[in-house]
């Protein structure tokens, strides 16, 4: 039986660390990288008699997410105790949400693949709920024992649960990337996967093509890169298919992915909800979100990627590809919008070309984010404007861009004037240069008249060289054709 006889079913649970300054139920700092246990309050270490106090900022970030995905923001939601024992969980339970989460439903549209084979798909979300993170067990520096760091205990998380709507690792990665971009766009999570701010758990099962019943799922825990997510799913899918075809059965389990071997390995048998004995936390009142509170958060929301993409297409005349690329991250979209604001909507397309082309390449080479680009939106807009009004050619523009990057002038105009780069558009001056080139390159002239088009390009190159790149390429082409025709 071939792989094509099987259908893959994937659902993702993503833990997004909310970017509040303090923890969800205490005033302790959430800053990353502190010495062990210096950011753990009495609440975090579960001293007797302490009570949790809900962080308003964490709730507002959950509301923001719910609004961004078109979900229902619950007027009333409830915190519950998820009971289990682990050394880095001092209370013996985790405060989470179970029956009544703060965000219910919602959708995210993803784009899978590139070029002609690309397609869009809508992934439904089940819920997103607030919860606290656990601490961290430390094994490396200890022999015969483990250390516990409770700095992370109580850090606010939004657990975002999708429906099992994805049918390939490519779709799962596209969903994770889109979600990652969204939480950063609406500024609820910094998305730093290396620091654990955005972690994915993948629930994977397989079933025969055409079957309605889901197969038994296995959950791959704590995937902290998109590459590992894809590799882990691909391995797990093949393992499940091979196991079933060899006569085995899949047992529900939690597994870990080993990046060194590219394999998943069993961690423990998978628990169901009843194993955690959820019940409402008696120390926390139900969370009530009034219509006024929700409306205020709505009023503070930025323009969302899909809305901005549609506006770029409809109002600025960009292609769907360009609009999608420019709205892939908030930083790029903000830079591009500022460039167009300075240059004018009529130059939206050349501005897009420069942001996606030369600027992106230069930033990539220098390993810089666009937010700290040495060339500002206003400077790039000035450069695009000088190309548009034929002050400089595209070739000269690249030199001006490099000069702006290196800080050799405050604006394109200043560099053009200082370095004498203004394009030569005087027909008489260009004709004089053409005459000199034709006189010195009789062989190329004869070859052109014999039907060799390459000879024409060689002559254009000689004229541009004679003008030190300053002659208008369009005028050179036009005048040279006339001369050769005569």
From Swiss-Prot:
Molecular function GO terms recorded: asparaginyl-tRNA synthase (glutamine-hydrolyzing) activity; ATP binding; glutaminyl-tRNA synthase (glutamine-hydrolyzing) activity
PROSITE patterns given in the database record: GATB (PS01234)
Keyword Nucleus on entry: no
Catalyses which reaction(s): L-glutamyl-tRNA(Gln) + L-glutamine + ATP + H2O = L-glutaminyl-tRNA(Gln) + L-glutamate + ADP + phosphate + H(+); L-aspartyl-tRNA(Asn) + L-glutamine + ATP + H2O = L-asparaginyl-tRNA(Asn) + L-glutamate + ADP + phosphate + 2 H(+)
EC numbers: 6.3.5.-
Keywords from the UniProt entry: ATP-binding, Ligase, Nucleotide-binding, Protein biosynthesis
Top EC class for this record: ligase
Quaternary context: Heterotrimer of A, B and C subunits.
HAMAP family assigned to the protein according to its UniProt record, in alphabetical order: GatB
UniProt cross-references to PANTHER family, sorted A to Z: GLUTAMYL-TRNA GLN AMIDOTRANSFERASE SUBUNIT B MITOCHONDRIAL AND PROKARYOTIC PET112-RELATED, GLUTAMYL-TRNA(GLN) AMIDOTRANSFERASE SUBUNIT B, MITOCHONDRIAL
Similarity remark: Belongs to the GatB/GatE family. GatB subfamily.
Protein name: Aspartyl/glutamyl-tRNA(Asn/Gln) amidotransferase subunit B
Native source species: Azoarcus sp. (strain BH72)
Encoding gene per record: gatB
């Amino acid at each position: 039986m071939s792989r094509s006889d099987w259908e893959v079913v994937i659902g993702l649970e993503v833990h997004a660390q909310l970017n509040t300054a303090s923890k969800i139920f205490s005033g302790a700092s959430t800053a990353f990288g502190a010495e062990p246990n210096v950011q753990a309050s009495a609440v975090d270490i579960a001293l007797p008699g302490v009570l949790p106090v809900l962080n308003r900022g964490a709730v507002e970030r959950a509301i923001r997410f719910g609004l961004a995905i078109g979900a229902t923001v619950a007027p009333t939601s409830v915190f519950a105790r998820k009971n289990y024992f682990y050394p880095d969980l001092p209370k013996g339970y985790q405060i989470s949400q179970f029956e009544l989460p703060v965000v219910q439903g919602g959708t995210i549209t993803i784009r899978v693949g590139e070029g002609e084979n690309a397609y869009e798909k809508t992934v439904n979300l089940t819920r997103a709920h607030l919860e606290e993170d656990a601490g961290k067990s430390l094994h490396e520096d200890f022999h015969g024992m483990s250390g516990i760091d409770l700095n992370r205990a109580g850090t606010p998380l939004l657990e975002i649960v999708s429906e099992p709507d994805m049918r390939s690792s490519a779709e799962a990665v596209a969903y994770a990337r889109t979600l990652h971009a969204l939480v950063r766009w609406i500024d609820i999570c910094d998305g730093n996967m290396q620091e654990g701010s955005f972690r994915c758990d993948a629930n994977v099962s397989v079933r025969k093509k055409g079957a309605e019943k889901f197969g038994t799922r296995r959950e791959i825990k704590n995937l902290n890169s998109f590459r590992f997510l894809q590799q882990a799913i691909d391995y797990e899918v093949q393992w499940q298919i091979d196991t079933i075809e060899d006569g085995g059965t899949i047992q529900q389990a939690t597994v870990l992915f080993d990046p060194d071997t590219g394999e998943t390995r069993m961690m423990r048998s998978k628990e169901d909800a009843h194993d955690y004995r959820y019940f409402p936390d008696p120390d926390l009142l139900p969370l009530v979100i009034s219509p006024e509170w929700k409306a205020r958060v709505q009023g503070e929301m930025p323009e969302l990627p899909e809305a901005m993409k549609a506006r770029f297409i409809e109002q600025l005349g960009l292609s769907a590809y360009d609009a999608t690329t420019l709205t892939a991250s908030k930083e790029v979209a903000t830079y591009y919008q500022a460039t167009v604001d300075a240059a004018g909507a009529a130059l939206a397309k050349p501005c897009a070309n420069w942001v996606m082309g030369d600027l992106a390449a230069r930033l990539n080479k220098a390993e810089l984010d666009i937010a700290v680009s040495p060339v500002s939106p206003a400077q790039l807009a000035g450069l695009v404007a000088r190309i548009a009004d034929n002050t400089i050619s595209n070739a000269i523009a690249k030199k001006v861009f490099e000069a702006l990057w290196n800080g050799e002038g405050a604006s394109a105009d200043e560099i053009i004037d200082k370095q004498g780069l203004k394009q030569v558009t005087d027909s008489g001056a260009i004709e004089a240069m053409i005459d000199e080139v034709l006189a010195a390159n009789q062989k190329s002239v004869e070859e052109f008249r014999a039907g060799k088009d390459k000879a024409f390009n060689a002559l254009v190159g000689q004229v541009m060289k004679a003008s030190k790149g300053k002659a208008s390429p369009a005028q050179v082409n036009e005048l040279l054709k006339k001369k050769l025709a005569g």
